[in-house]
Amino acid sequence: MIFQRGMLDDLADDLRLRAKMPASWGIVIVMLLVHLWTQGEVGSGNGDAWYECLGLSREGMSDGRYWQIFSHGLLHGSWPHLSVNAVLIWLLGTRMERMLGWRAMLGVTCLGMIAGGLMHLLLGHGLLVGISGGVMALLLCLATLSPDARVLPLGISAKNLGRGILVGELVLTLADPALGMPIISSIGAMLVDHGYASVFQLGHACHLGGGLMGVIIALRWRAPRLTLEMLRLQREMRERDSKR
C-alpha cells in the first residue's frame, strides 16, 4: 500500500509539472483549434480547398505556396490522427521543456516539422498533413540526449529504440511502390498485394526527416563547445610542444 501511494504521489507530481509547460500545451491547443475549424470547413464543402492550400505537396510548392512547409504541421486528417499527435506532443514536448526550456522544445519541433516536410517533398508523395515530423524530432532528440534511459513498458534503451525507428522508417520510405526503387519497392508492392496498402498511407519520409533532424540537434548539443578558456589552454599546449 505504501508502494502504491508512493507511485501515485510520483504520478501526481509529474502531472503537476507537465501542467506548467506552456509551449507544449500551446501547440496542442492550436492544433485542436485548427482541426475544429477545418472540420467546420469540411462540413460546409470547403474542406478540400483548405487542405490543398495548407497541406504540403510538390504541386503547392511549385505554385509558390511556400507557407505549406509550416502550415502542414497544424492540419490533421482525422480525430484519431490529431489525438495521437497531441498525446505525443504532450508527453515528449513537456519532457523536453522540463529539461531544456520552452525555446528548445519549440525549436526542435519546428525544425523537425520543416525537415520532415522537405524529406516528404524529396521521397514522399501526395498531400502531407500532421505534426509527425516534429514529434519524431522530439522523440529522437530525447533518445540521443539520454541514450541509456530505459523506455517503459518496452524495457529497451532509448538508443536502441531510436535506431530501430530510424531504420524502420528508412526501409518503409524506400519500399513505397510509388517511389519505384529497384528491388526494395517490389517488396512494398508485395505488401500492397497482400492487403497492407495502408502501411504506405503514413508519411514515413516525413518521420525519417524529422527523426534525423532530432538526432542532429542532439548531437550538436552534446558536442563540447569551445570557450575562451579552452582556446587558451590549447594555445598553451601548442606553445609547450613547440619548445620541446
Language model feature labels by segment:
Residues 1-32, 36, 103, 118, ...:
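C-terminal transmembrane module of polytopic alpha-helical membrane proteins
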Residues 3, 24, 83-87, 135, ...:
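Residue-level signal for the membrane-embedded core of alpha-helical transmembrane segments
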Residues 11-14, 66-150, 179-180, 184-209:
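Transmembrane helix-loop-helix
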Residues 16-20, 57-63, 155:
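Helix-boundary and loop/linker segments of multi-pass membrane transporters
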Residues 40-59:
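Interfacial/capping segments of alpha-helical transmembrane domains
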Residues 41-42, 62-63, 120-124, 143-150, ...:
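Juxtamembrane membrane-interface segments at transmembrane alpha-helix termini
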Residues 98, 145-158, 223-230:
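Alpha-helical transmembrane bundle and helix-membrane interface signal
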Residues 109-112, 154-169:
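Central hydrophobic cores of alpha-helical transmembrane segments
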